[in-house]
A protein has these predicted regions:
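Short, charged/polar connector segments at secondary-structure boundaries
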Residues: 1, 5-89, 95-109
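Residues that form generic nucleotide/phosphate-binding pockets
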Residues: 3, 44, 100, 104, ...
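Amphipathic, charge-rich alpha-helical segments that serve as recognition/docking helices
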Residues: 30, 74-169, 176-179, 186, ...
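Amphipathic, non-transmembrane alpha-helical secondary structure
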Residues: 39-42, 120, 200
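Residues at the start of alpha-helices and the adjacent loop-to-helix junctions
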Residues: 67-68, 143, 180, 217
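EF-Ts-like protein-protein interaction surfaces
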Residues: 166-172, 182-230
Length: 230
């Protein structure tokens, strides 16, 4: 009806919001760093402004929580701006997480750790939305498991999504080595099945040997750990 259309239009209206009132999304898994790409973005914002409005939601503690637009927010700060354009939406936690993840997965360069925690957050949100994992996918008109939905919308197989999420079980030191390419993806997945203390022991051994494990070595270490021999 006319009233609901007016409300939707009002909700989607672009507003100029002070940067000081915009807060990062809690648990945001994507890094915002002042690298060369950020400097280019800041220069663009300085010259042309923010061309795509951020999406934010009201923060119960005051101001707004950024759902999509963390890099644009930082670039605006570096460009010396005081405000940035944003669309305010009333989103519950699950809807906000899904939107935040989907928006950031469009980036060209994403670290394995970022993708891992993003998939995990989205999976948990989809499950929580209805407390069921057989949610209906409108795209294909059939019931799909939550893991399948995450994969389908990211262009990944269910198995690959699961493997990425396994990386969230790695201790921070090993996960950093995956991000920097010191440990390859497949061996890292195998190492994620080790307990934290076993991972720490492995890290010490790896430092001593000055070498990263191959996939077969990681599989062997995982097998020994499961058999209680590691």
């Amino acid at each position: 009806d006319v009233c609901s259309s007016d409300r939707e239009a009002q909700q989607e209206r672009v507003q100029e919001i002070p940067l000081s009132e915009l807060h990062p999304f809690e648990g945001h898994p994507f890094r915002v760093v002042d690298d060369e790409e950020m400097m280019k973005t800041a220069e663009s914002v300085r010259d042309f402004g923010v061309l795509t409005p951020a999406i934010v939601r009201p923060d119960p503690d005051g101001g707004y929580e950024i759902v999509s637009g963390h890099r644009r927010h930082r670039a605006s700060e570096l460009a010396g701006k005081e405000t940035m354009p944003a669309i305010v939406r009333d989103l519950d936690d699950d809807a906000a997480i899904i939107l935040m993840v989907d928006a950031n997965l469009q980036r060209e360069s994403i670290l394995p750790s970022e993708r891992a925690f993003a998939y995990k957050m989205k999976l948990d949100a989809i499950k929580h939305q209805g407390q069921r994992t057989d949610l209906t996918s409108s795209q294909v008109g059939m019931k799909l498991q939550a893991m399948d939905i995450v994969g389908q919308e990211a262009g990944e197989s269910r198995n690959q999504v699961h493997r990425y999420i396994r990386l969230t079980e790695l201790i921070p030191e090993l996960l950093d080595m995956v991000d920097t390419g010191q440990i390859k993806f497949n061996p890292a997945v195998e190492l994620s099945y080790l307990a934290s203390e076993e991972q720490k022991d492995f890290l010490s051994a790896m430092d001593y040997a000055q070498a990263a494990p191959s996939l077969s070595q990681a599989q062997r270490i995982k097998k020994l750990a499961q058999e209680g021999e590691c």
